[in-house]
Every structure is written in C-alpha cells, then in structure tokens.
C-alpha cells in the first residue's frame, strides 16, 4: 500500500515522539542530574538525581542512597519528580491516541469522526509532554547556575555542575516538541478522505426491459428488477 505524504509526516511525528518519550524515561531514572567534583579528592565524584545521590569512586563500586523524604528535597527536585512522571503518562497516552487517529493504522470499527478527535487529543497531549519535560530540566539547571555563582558561598566549597541527564532531558523535550509539531502540521496538510455512508436499504439488482419508441420501434433499457412489469 502506497502511503500519502500526510501519512509519512504522521509516521515521522510518531517516531520522534516515541524517541522523545524513551529519552525522557531514561532521564528520570539516571542520577546524573548534577555532579560535584571534590578538589581534595579528585578520585571521588558525587552525582545527584531526583531519586538518589551517589558517590562514584575510581576502582570502587558506585554507592547510591535514595532520598529518605520527599519533603526534604529542594523545591526544584520536588517539582521535577512530579512533572517528569506526569510527562511519561502524557507522552504514552498521546502516542497511543495519535496512533489510533493517524492514517498509518487503519481500524475498521473506529468511526472517522471519533478517529479525528483521538488524533487531536493525542497531539495536545504530546505538546503537554514536551512542556512537562523541558520545564523541570530547565528549572534544575537554573537552580544549579544560581548556586554556582552565589557570592555568599565561600570559594573553597565545591559547587554542583550540570550532569549528563540534563542534556538528555533537553534532547527528550526537543524530540517531543518536534514530534508534536509534525503531528499538528499533518493535520493542516489537507482534509482526510471521509468515507461515504452506506445505503440504508439493500442494493436492487438491475435488469433489462423493452421500451417502445414513438415510431413503434423498441430498445432495451436498464431498470431495477422490482420495477419491471
């Protein structure tokens, strides 16, 4: 089956959204949101995520400890937990709805109007998933920058810096945003083919019946069988 340009754009949007959703899940799990290198002990690196804090020592296994209380976390990490989990739910639900509402997948028992509404709702959820991914990652980055350049902290105290998970989170948000934009753009390419409604009654078979002309000659004419006398 040859796919239309509209279907290819929808497929590209779905793949980008799926990639962004996977990257967002990995970002949530990784502890490398912030890193801290100790000048007194260069062989030891501290890493902090939204779920745990770890100490990475060379030639020694990494030791991690989960945060004991949600309320004891900084405000940016509390918000990051909530929004990242919400992003996973919105992204997954948006992917499913966009798949059901796209031309890439055909379901005979789904009505066209209902399918179009599913696609519209899915595109909205994908855009929301992008926002709920970029916001917590950017907030944690902003808080890290503020603490790094805080003049009230003595220079001898080590400062937290960006971890690799922040860059992955930004990439996830961009992929989700691009996927959502492609899905929205596909809706503006043109109208979908609306299926014609089925006839209310059964189809009447045709038959030939003679018709008399004014000059006395006859010719055959197609008529419904139930109208032939």
Curated annotation (Swiss-Prot):
The chain crosses the membrane at residues 11-31, 82-102, 125-145, 165-185. Its main location: other. Residues 1-10, 103-124, 186-229 are cytoplasmic. Coiled coil: none annotated. InterPro entries: Claudin, PMP22/EMP/MP20/Claudin. GO terms for biological process: bicellular tight junction assembly; cell adhesion. The keyword S-adenosyl-L-methionine does not apply. Keywords: Cell junction, Cell membrane, Membrane, Tight junction, Transmembrane, Transmembrane helix. It comes from the Eukaryota. It is a multi-pass membrane protein. One of its GO terms (cellular component) is tight junction. It is found in: Cell junction, Tight junction; Cell membrane. Belongs to the claudin family. Plays a major role in tight junction-specific obliteration of the intercellular space, through calcium-independent cell-adhesion activity. This is Claudin-25. It comes from Homo sapiens (Human). The gene is CLDN25.
